[in-house]
């Protein structure tokens, strides 16, 4: 079984969730399929011109057969009460504004990722030299939040 091509980025300070997930499930692991995995990747929609559409994605799994799987890794501290999201910060429970809720942020990042790859597939440059236009096909993108406690 092949190992994934893993491009490791920087881990967030004061948050071990991503690193623990990578160590447990990705690094030095064998996969049944050939995957390219990008960690902590900054993206920009090349079709947006000068608009600021930057975003950081925790993990992107890329496979020619299955498409793109986008994972956002979240540690503890989140809770939901009556549809309202909260995050515990330094022991204090704070209500999150709608734009900062994990599901909302995931949807925004998935839309940015979809636009980025669709524009690259149409010939716009993107993702530096990691992906070439002819390597990107219009494949499905699936996004998940992974809760690590």
Show the residue positions of the predicted features.
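Intrinsically disordered, low-complexity Ser/Thr/Pro/Gly-rich regulatory segments
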Residues: 1-149
């Amino acid at each position: 079984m092949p190992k994934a091509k893993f491009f490791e980025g920087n881990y967030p300070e004061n948050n071990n969730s991503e690193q623990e997930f990578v160590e447990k499930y990705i690094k030095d692991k064998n996969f049944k399929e050939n995957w390219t995995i990008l960690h902590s990747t900054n993206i920009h929609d090349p079709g947006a011109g000068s608009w600021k559409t930057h975003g950081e994605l925790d993990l992107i799994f890329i496979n020619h057969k299955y498409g793109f799987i986008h994972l956002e890794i979240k540690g503890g501290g989140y809770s939901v009460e009556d549809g309202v999201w909260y995050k515990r910060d330094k022991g204090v429970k704070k209500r999150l504004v709608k734009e900062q809720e994990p599901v909302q942020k995931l949807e925004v990042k998935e839309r940015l990722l979809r636009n980025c790859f669709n524009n690259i597939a149409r010939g716009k440059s993107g993702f530096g030299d990691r992906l070439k236009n002819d390597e990107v096909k219009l494949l499905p993108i699936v996004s998940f939040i992974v809760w690590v406690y």
